[in-house]
């Protein structure tokens, strides 16, 4: 199933009513707290890279980690293609709003964690997606991948970022591919209540 063909994905439900009329334009929109919902093209590209090898199975990913829940739109898409999604958000009001929206959509396979993602446990994941940009690829994220697992994230500073796709080949070997230039919010430390 191609993400770009999911016209039934209710992006407007994840936005404030004042800008919901722009929900289906291919652009990033503000969601408050100096955060944005990514443009649909980028959301689709990131999700498709995570599920690219597994499209023939009903639910391709067993365990997915998302860093930066934001409004929950990307979380919603990940929940369609994953048995279980763990999503981390550092801004409590955003997390609460995303949780409410996903509950209204009857999404039941998402676990919400209020944290900045810096103190990850040792759990392994089939897929990891970060919606915030660190300055470089964090080693702790690569180490959280199962063998065959995939990581996609923006990397760089506020002026120049690249969308990076990483696949874990073996215990100590990874492939890394630069996909395109992007602009995401930075990955920050600390929790905002």
Residue ranges and their predicted role:
Residues 23-26, 37-61:
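Conserved alpha-helix/loop element of class I SAM-dependent methyltransferases that forms part
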């Amino acid at each position: 199933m191609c993400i770009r063909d999911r016209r039934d994905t209710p992006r407007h439900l994840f936005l404030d009513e004042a800008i919901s009329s722009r929900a289906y334009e291919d652009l990033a929109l503000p969601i408050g707290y100096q955060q944005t919902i990514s443009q649909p093209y980028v959301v689709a590209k990131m999700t498709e890279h995570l599920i690219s090898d597994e499209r023939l199975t009903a639910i391709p990913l067993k365990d997915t980690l998302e860093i930066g829940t934001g409004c929950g739109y990307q979380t919603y898409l990940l929940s369609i293609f994953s048995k279980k999604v763990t999503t981390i958000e550092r801004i409590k009001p955003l997390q609460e709003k995303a949780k409410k929206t996903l509950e209204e959509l009857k999404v039941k396979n998402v676990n919400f964690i209020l944290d900045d993602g810096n103190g990850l446990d040792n759990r392994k994941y089939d897929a990891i997606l970060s919606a915030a940009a660190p300055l470089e690829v964090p080693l702790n994220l690569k180490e959280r991948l199962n063998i065959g697992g995939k990581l996609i994230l923006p990397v760089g500073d506020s002026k120049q970022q690249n969308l990076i796709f990483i696949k874990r080949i073996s215990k100590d070997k990874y492939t890394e591919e630069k996909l395109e230039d992007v602009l995401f919010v930075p990955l920050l430390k600390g929790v905002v209540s």
